[in-house]
Amino acid sequence: MLTLDTLRAFGANVDEGLGRCMKNEAFYLRMVRMSLADGNFEKLVQAAETNDLDAAFEAAHALKGVLANLALTPMSAAAGELTELLRNRTPGDYVPAAKRILALRDELKALDA
């Protein structure tokens, strides 16, 4: 079950995330769960696999914003790093980084099972 304690153990800055959700725990947890269903996780991996850098950037950037607003630090940091690599068109294979973000999402989803 997803709780504030499981989010803290995951590495989220729960106090910051709660602050953005008017200190409403139920609302914050609902927003976290909604973020885990964001289709941009899959879009990011697919775009990275097909080397569609524009689509990968859009998905990574969108995820970075959502995850940062909820203070899901491990995922937002990874999405932020990938966003900047894509923004700068840094040469490289983006698939491992995209899959790492997806794996973090799956790890957090498993905590909600």
PLM feature segments, named:
Residues 1-113:
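Two-component system phosphorelay core
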